[in-house]
């Protein structure tokens, strides 16, 4: 196949993976949204490798849309970062296999700390899924990688599950453009949402006549 055919096949596989996931969205998704909405703590996202990279994006999306959240690397967690975890925090653990050792090692602490655990995995019968209070299924029929090794369709499914949670929480909270502007004061979004006429208008305008000399203009 040429590069265009490969690209089209990859997109087809990943779209089919998302449709497969869509058909299985159910009560546990509603439960996850409800628990996150009602918590008085933060939402801590955790994952290794590609799952961790996707987790960072999910945490950033949560934080910028009214859900206090941050990413915690499981390796760093074992070297002091667990001190940031409060009992009222919700812990979202991401692992496609549900057997990532670095993530599983956190379970005893989380249970002892009485944290509510949401697992995002592609295997409902995995150790992580079975030890979570709520499980979000991101299983896909196959990866786009021809060798079924590189995370592709599964990471896309994880990302979209995170987006679905983010938007569902925005809807549940009635998150408005004004709320969005509060968290995005910089960049083009901030300027578009927050700029007022008084910020751009000035009283002292440098007015010169058409017959003024260049020396007068620059002075």
Regions flagged by a language model, labelled:
Residues 28-32, 77-81, 216-217:
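Short acidic active-site motifs
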Residues 188-219:
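Bateman/CBS regulatory modules and CBS-like beta-alpha motifs in cytosolic regions of diverse proteins
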Residues 2-41:
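An N-terminal, well-structured beta->alpha segment
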């Amino acid at each position: 196949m040429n590069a265009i055919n490969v690209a089209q096949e990859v997109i087809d596989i990943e779209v089919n993976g998302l449709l497969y996931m869509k058909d299985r969205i159910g009560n546990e998704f509603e439960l996850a949204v409800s628990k996150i909405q009602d918590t008085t703590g933060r939402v801590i996202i955790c994952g290794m490798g590609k799952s961790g990279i996707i987790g960072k994006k999910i945490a950033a999306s949560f934080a910028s849309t009214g859900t206090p959240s941050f990413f915690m690397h499981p390796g760093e967690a074992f070297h002091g970062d667990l001190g940031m975890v409060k009992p009222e925090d919700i812990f979202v653990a991401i692992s496609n296999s549900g057997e990532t050792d670095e993530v599983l090692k956190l379970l005893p602490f989380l249970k002892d700390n009485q944290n509510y655990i949401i697992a995002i995995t592609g295997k409902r019968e995995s150790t992580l899924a079975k030890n979570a209070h709520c499980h979000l299924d991101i299983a896909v029929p196959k990866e786009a990688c021809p060798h079924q090794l590189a995370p592709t369709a599964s990471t896309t499914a994880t990302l979209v599950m995170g987006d679905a949670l983010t938007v569902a929480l925005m809807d549940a909270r009635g998150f408005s453009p004004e709320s969005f502007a509060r968290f995005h004061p910089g960049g083009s979004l901030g300027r578009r949402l927050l700029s007022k006429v008084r910020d751009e208008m000035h009283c002292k305008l440098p007015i010169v006549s058409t017959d003024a000399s260049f020396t007068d203009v620059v002075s």
